[in-house]
Amino acid sequence: MSGQHTKEISDCRFASADLQYNSDKSKIYNQKSKIIIMSYSEKVIGHYQNPKNVGTLDKSAKNVGTGLVGAPECGDVMRLQIEVDDATGMITDAKFKTFGCGSAIASSSLATEWLKGKSVDEALTIDNMDIVEELNLPPVKIHCSVLAEDAIKAAINDYRVKNGKEAIKFEESVVH
């Protein structure tokens, strides 16, 4: 990519007719200027094209925690849910629904995969930079990984409050 300029697309939906994917769909470029707009890793493409754990859990269930976070600047909204085995404290299932760009969907998909089989306390150690590194997200898409981390914490808080436990202290990140 050296010698080429990249730019962030403010509307994450790539609606312009001038924008096209290259043959393996790893890059989005402007057809007229031939400037690469965004380059995605194979892992992002894989999670975007075949997202894992899309769906919902019963949010009224006592053992289900739901986190809903969003980034109004980009339009990304992420709902992530966890199901916890009350006897063991282990996360037995995780689901998500995300309205947003490929990086937001990939971050959600990866996060749900990582959550399954972890204890609630272990889940709190998932950091947005772990997601950035695993997916090789470009700097302009780091906010997507922050949303995933915030959604995890919000889901855990919802679960904890439903079960009479103290909520963890965290502030939803301001995403730019």
Question: Predicted regions span which residues?
Answer:
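Glycine/charged-rich beta-loop-alpha catalytic/anionic-binding loops adjacent to active sites
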Residues: D85-F96, M129-E134
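Short, thiol/selenol-centered motifs that function as redox-active sites or metal-ligating centers
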Residues: C74, T98-A106, C144
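Long, acidic, intrinsically disordered low-complexity segments
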Residues: N50, T56, A94-G102
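Structured beta-strand/loop patches that form or line metal/cofactor-binding pockets in enzymes
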Residues: P51-I91
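Alpha-helical support elements that line or immediately flank enzyme active sites
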Residues: S103-K118
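C-terminal binding/interaction regions
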Residues: M38-K59, G65-G67, K118-H176
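Short, basic, low-complexity termini and linkers enriched in Ser/Thr/Gly/Pro
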Residues: M1-I37, V174-V175
